[in-house]
Amino acid sequence: MPVTLGYWDIRGLGHAIRLLLEYTETGYEEKRYAMGDAPDYDRSQWLNDKFKLDLDFPNLPYLIDGSHKVTQSNAILRYLGRKHNLCGETEEERIRVDILEKQVMDTRIQMGMLCYSADFEKRKPEFLKGLPDQLKLYSEFLGKQPWFAGDKITFADFLVYDVLDQHRMFEPTCLDAFPNLKDFMARFEGLRKISAYMKTSRFLPSPVYLKQATWGNE
């Protein structure tokens, strides 16, 4: 029986999950909820379902896999990672995965705060000024390894790919100073299942954010 992934009909926090489902060849169905236009941004599609799914903490995204019902995007990724041995094999690898999971969320929040800001144009130059220092940390953490935890891919690579790709969409040249990050992106996109997924109609690279955002809402 396929699992069900519920989320808004955007990229958002669902992107890394969709990529991981595809990579692991997990049979899944999507419930994509649409949000209405301004000024009301009607959420009734989701609200009509929200308290009918028996979720402990009703929220989007959610994953339903038989009797297992998981919310919180990183918890979903960890759940899938455990099922498919993609959480790191050594203690050092698991530590690196733990660090990346939290670091990516920090990076994601910083970009989201900018893109949802009414002062987007005013704040954008400062964000771009600090971006190389942020990306340098990822570059140094990756080093010469093929994947962020080591020689084998983990669910953390799906998170890092997602957030780096969002930044590349925002500022196309931002990775040019970091050849190892560019190689990582190409390596990830070259994975057989990922490459195939990106050619399908299921692939949803945008909109990155919901309709209230100033950037990434289309």
From Swiss-Prot:
The organism's lineage?
Eukaryota, Metazoa, Chordata, Craniata, Vertebrata
Function description: Conjugation of reduced glutathione to a wide number of exogenous and endogenous hydrophobic electrophiles.
Q: Which reaction does it catalyse?
A: RX + glutathione = an S-substituted glutathione + a halide anion + H(+)
What Enzyme Commission number(s) appear in the record? 2.5.1.18
Q: Does the keyword Transferase apply?
A: yes
Q: Which GO terms describe its cellular component?
A: cytoplasm
Q: What Gene3D superfamilies does the entry give?
A: 1.20.1050.10, Glutaredoxin
What GO molecular function annotations does the UniProt record carry, in alphabetical order?
Answer: glutathione transferase activity
Question: Which key words are in the record?
Answer: Cytoplasm, Transferase
What is the organism field in this record? Mus musculus
Q: What is this protein called?
A: Glutathione S-transferase Mu 6
| First-listed, main subcellular location of the protein, grouped into a coarse class | cytoplasm
| InterPro entries cross-referenced by the UniProt entry | Glutathione-S-Trfase_C-like, Glutathione-S-Trfase_C_sf, Glutathione_S-Trfase_N, GST_C, GST_mu, GST_superfamily, Thioredoxin-like_sf
PROSITE patterns (UniProt xref): GST_CTER, GST_NTER
Known tissue expression: Expressed in liver, stomach and small intestine. Not expressed in spleen, kidney, colon, heart, muscle, brain or lung.
Matching entries from Pfam families are given as: GST_C, GST_N
Coiled-coil region(s):
none
The primary gene name is Gstm6
Q: Where is the GST C-terminal domain?
A: 90-208
**What is stated as this protein's family in its record?**
Belongs to the GST superfamily. Mu family.
Outline the extent of the GST N-terminal domain: 1-88
Where does the chain bind substrate? Y116
